[in-house]
Amino acid sequence: MPPSGLRLLPLLLPLLWLLVLTPGRPAAGLSTCKTIDMELVKRKRIEAIRGQILSKLRLASPPSQGDVPPGPLPEAVLALYNSTRDRVAGESVEPEPEPEADYYAKEVTRVLMVESGNQIYDKFKGTPHSLYMLFNTSELREAVPEPVLLSRAELRLLRLKLKVEQHVELYQKYSNDSWRYLSNRLLAPSDSPEWLSFDVTGVVRQWLTRREAIEGFRLSAHCSCDSKDNTLHVEINGFNSGRRGDLATIHGMNRPFLLLMATPLERAQHLHSSRHRRALDTNYCFSSTEKNCCVRQLYIDFRKDLGWKWIHEPKGYHANFCLGPCPYIWSLDTQYSKVLALYNQHNPGASAAPCCVPQALEPLPIVYYVGRKPKVEQLSNMIVRSCKCS
């Protein structure tokens, strides 16, 4: 039996003759020679935003402003809006992972907390309002050699039975034995065990860049000013079990752990090259003359562009949009473009080349009136912060 390549040769000959005899010209279905009308693109983006805002607020049309009281917004409403805006701004400062790393499959690793009986916990004993979870960073670095490879990190805790409702807070071990607040959780009474999960991606990235041998978390009872009982009533698997033998081993395997999702180094070697692509975010795109896929600036003035007076804060915002060609391995000025043209002809519903689309989006807080009542809302995914080819 002839090799498979020889069996396919009769099928490939007509296509090869087509490539030789057809004059060299770009594939008609893939031409990008048309001039982009930027004003038309912006108008379409503005109209899309009009519908997006109304849809997110579940409004069929802009609300009437006939009953809106004159004068400035109430101080309490303005304070709520400002705090929401500041929180969103603070969250956007967090570094984004490399866009290229998102493409690769992620390897999942579990790193167990150092056993609670270890002597490194001695200085934390005698604190009934807190539990301490320490991790050996050498195990973290073995699983994730470089911070850029980390996609996500979760702290997982197995909560056992809880008789009373309790508000708990999670802290990160910081410099000089201080503790930095991370998040909180309200735990309801339950007769069955439950896994708790906290996103600690940013924290673990920090640990990977530092050289501390031991890092950790603290789970504490919420300290309320009007409560005299600050005891942590939550029982977490892996602490003071009192078990021996096989039961102790099983109990220890379910002690708190970090679940790490990271790109294996061998799958992402190009991330460490000095030639790796820049993140297509506002920091790069707004300060360059990039012609390919990038974030393009677009400021929406609610009154001027949408004819709206019902949104009282902000007066407008930078919506931005993604635009630009995505470089493709089969260039249009090569003979391979004819193969792509045939592919397009037989697969009209498929995309032969990647498109420039949003990657990171930010929310937009607004203040508007419903009748005489002011409302503060946060609209998700309203600001394009970075783009990618997909």
Swiss-Prot record:
InterPro entries from the UniProt entry: Cystine-knot_cytokine, TGF-b_C, TGF-b_propeptide, TGF-beta, TGF-beta-rel, TGFb1, TGFb_CS
UniProt keywords, alphabetically: Cleavage on pair of basic residues, Disulfide bond, Extracellular matrix, Glycoprotein, Growth factor, Mitogen, Secreted, Signal
**Could you give the subunit structure recorded for this chain?**
Homodimer; disulfide-linked. Interacts with the serine proteases, HTRA1 and HTRA3: the interaction with either inhibits TGFB1-mediated signaling and the HTRA protease activity is required for this inhibition. May interact with THSD4; this interaction may lead to sequestration by FBN1 microfibril assembly and attenuation of TGFB signaling. Interacts with CD109, DPT and ASPN. Interacts with EFEMP2. Interacts with TSKU; the interaction contributes to regulation of the hair cycle. Interacts with TGFBR3.
Q: What is this protein called?
A: Transforming growth factor beta-1 proprotein
Q: Which GO terms describe its molecular function?
A: cytokine activity; deubiquitinase activator activity; enzyme binding; growth factor activity; identical protein binding; protein serine/threonine kinase activator activity; type I transforming growth factor beta receptor binding; type II transforming growth factor beta receptor binding
Q: What is the effect of changing residue 104 to A/C/S/T?
A: Results in spontaneous, non integrin-dependent activation
| Annotated region described as Straightjacket domain, given as residue ranges | 30-74
In terms of Pfam families, this protein maps to: TGF_beta (PF00019), TGFb_propeptide (PF00688)
Q: Which gene encodes it?
A: TGFB1
Residue window of motif Cell attachment site? 244-246
Q: What the entry says about post-translational processing?
A: Transforming growth factor beta-1 proprotein: The precursor proprotein is cleaved in the Golgi apparatus by FURIN to form Transforming growth factor beta-1 (TGF-beta-1) and Latency-associated peptide (LAP) chains, which remain non-covalently linked, rendering TGF-beta-1 inactive.
From which organism does this entry originate?
Answer: Sus scrofa (Pig)
Which is one Gene Ontology cellular component term of this protein? extracellular matrix
What residues bear carbohydrate chains?
82, 136, 176
